[in-house]
């Protein structure tokens, strides 16, 4: 079965670090956009799905009626498994009871809340529209309303973030009724407001060494509090790993609907335009046929992000080659350095390897 990703490119206020495709939300434009989603979905009518993920600007910016239309489309057009994991993203400050009810009634059973921090000063410096109290109350209310599978997103290496403020954020996070936590380091993207402020010396952002120490502390703290790391940036209580994202990391097929979304089907990737007007107007997809080397590189880079790593057997069945014939020298080098390990037929990163994963993964391209 495939996964389905739906991109909602609207936001109330763009965060200072964000370089994603997003636009101010006007109801008439959003209505046209939802109609365009329905039109695109028809290209895949009857496809079997066992995961759905609505992401973007966030989706909670939509009206209850628009949320209802999007969820109804999923079940009308696709063959959705009875145990489908159906996730939507939401931000504190953009959600209310009518929207929550539309989500639950529409079959959504998992929600990912963009908290980032429980420190108000840090939130202001990255341009979030909510404060820590709103974030805390939102998660408690989602639980009360019936969401039993809640993820919260956190960020480290934020402007003025200290170990003390990080510890407070993590303590608050694990005290909440959540089953999954994602923790990402702030990446300063070119052309974003935060990059401009940083280049002018207006922000005190933790250096690379401190960022790594914060990451290692986060991994250790979450593990001790029942959240097992299963991917570089993702932690879950038993049985609550994000099945949709695992599809990406294990090279399974998925469909992408909406601006800037892409699909992976067969040997091809299909890319949608990032221009919302072109998308609403029915712009054609860009199609790129993947070479075997492309697929091998993706298999390695995404697979090694997961704690379980990559399987020799899986590699052989997919590509008809022994993984050691292709990457034997790389494995030997990183195992000797203590950055990788080989256990029960799988190559994976050690904790030290995870800490410098970017430099390791580029060796497998």
Regions found by a protein language model. Give the residues of each.
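Minor-groove-contacting beta-hairpin "wing" of winged helix-turn-helix DNA-binding domains
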Residues: 346-350
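A short, polar/proline- and glycine-enriched secondary-structure boundary/capping micro-motif
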Residues: 267-269, 337, 359-361
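A short, conserved structural fragment
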Residues: 335-345
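Immediate flanking context of iron-sulfur cluster ligation sites
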Residues: 1-8
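C-terminal scaffold of the Radical SAM
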Residues: 1, 22-321
């Amino acid at each position: 079965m495939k996964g389905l990703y739906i991109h909602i490119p609207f936001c109330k206020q763009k965060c200072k670090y964000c370089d994603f495709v997003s636009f101010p939300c006007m109801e008439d434009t959003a209505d046209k956009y939802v109609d365009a989603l329905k039109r695109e979905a028809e290209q895949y009518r009857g496809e079997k799905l066992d995961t759905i993920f609505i992401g973007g600007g966030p989706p909670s910016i939509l009206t209850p009626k628009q949320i209802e239309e999007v969820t109804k489309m999923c079940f009308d057009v696709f063959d959705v498994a009875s145990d489908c994991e159906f996730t939507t993203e939401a931000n504190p400050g953009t959600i209310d009871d009518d929207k929550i009810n539309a989500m639950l009634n529409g079959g959504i059973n998992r929600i990912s809340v963009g908290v980032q921090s429980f420190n108000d000063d840090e939130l202001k410096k990255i341009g979030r529209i909510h404060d820590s109290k709103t974030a805390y109350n939102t998660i408690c209310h989602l639980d009360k309303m019936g969401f039993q599978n809640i993820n919260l997103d956190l960020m480290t290496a934020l402007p003025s973030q200290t170990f003390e403020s990080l510890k407070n954020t993590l303590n608050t996070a694990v005290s909440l009724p959540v089953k999954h936590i994602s923790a990402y380091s702030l990446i300063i993207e070119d052309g974003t407001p935060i990059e401009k402020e940083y280049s002018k010396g207006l922000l005190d952002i933790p250096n690379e060494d401190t960022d790594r120490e914060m990451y290692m502390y986060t991994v250790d703290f979450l593990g001790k509090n029942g959240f097992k790391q299963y991917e570089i940036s993702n932690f879950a209580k038993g049985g609550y790993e994000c099945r949709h994202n695992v599809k990406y990391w294990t090279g399974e097929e998925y469909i992408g609907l909406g601006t800037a979304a892409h699909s992976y089907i067969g040997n091809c990737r299909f890319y949608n335009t990032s221009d919302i007007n072109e998308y609403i107007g029915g712009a054609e997809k860009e199609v790129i046929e993947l070479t075997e080397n492309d697929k091998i590189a993706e298999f390695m880079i995404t697979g090694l992000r997961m704690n379980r790593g990559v399987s020799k057997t899986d590699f052989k069945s997919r590509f008809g080659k022994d993984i050691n014939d292709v990457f034997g020298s790389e494995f030997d080098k990183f195992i000797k350095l203590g950055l990788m390990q080989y256990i029960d037929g799988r190559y994976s990163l050690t904790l030290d390897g995870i800490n410098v994963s970017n430099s390791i993964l580029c060796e497998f391209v």
